[in-house]
């Protein structure tokens, strides 16, 4: 069996749960194109249990992976703007690797008074943790192809062999698991076959998509013994909590946590019980 997911520190000042509890219901926006961002939200909620959360998923344009960069930037800025016009936000978390790698500069230019946190593949800590010098990045095909990903590898993992594996099927499997469907380990073995067949496979695997931590248990059962699985969820949570707790002005809300979708359809209806399990008792449609 592989080793459980490692909690790596790739962000600055850490916030504790006791610190977070002193904050009076700040509103934190967590955005993703799908439901993978719930894995990030889950980590943040552990640090800020008393915060008010708004989860937004763009089911109208999901998945972002194959969309043009210009489309993603314009789309994300529009969606975040629509939420910010209606709610006073203490922090914005872009819980999507694809959106983070292209839209953060535009968002930070527009929302200069709201801290914004993005998600990037944890290449740097993986390069430090590996014992055999072989790192695997498991991500969407788009993240695997993006120049930003290769820049991270060139900056932080030049002394390692980094094997990239892009899969849209894993995203679909994670979504199905959230709906209560059993994940086939045989299917995972087929997807991971390029690594499993190697004489020296990665001993450290980076989960480069926020959907993939939802499959952690199944991935651990399929990967070789001793494999470390890491992602940036814990670091993102610590960074978000620190930014919220250390604000001069607390942006508070008395609302219950809820979710926004961009399109009301059968898919969004099926997600309602899933979202409720995560603490989002209400699902609304966001008008752009």
UniProtKB/Swiss-Prot annotation:
The active site is at residues 96, 209. The keyword Cell wall biogenesis/degradation applies. GO terms for molecular function: glutamate racemase activity. Substrate binds at residues 32-33, 64-65, 97-98, 210-211. Belongs to the aspartate/glutamate racemases family. Provides the (R)-glutamate required for cell wall biosynthesis. This is Glutamate racemase. It comes from Proteus mirabilis (strain HI4320). The lineage of its organism: Bacteria, Pseudomonadati, Pseudomonadota, Gammaproteobacteria, Enterobacterales. The gene is murI.
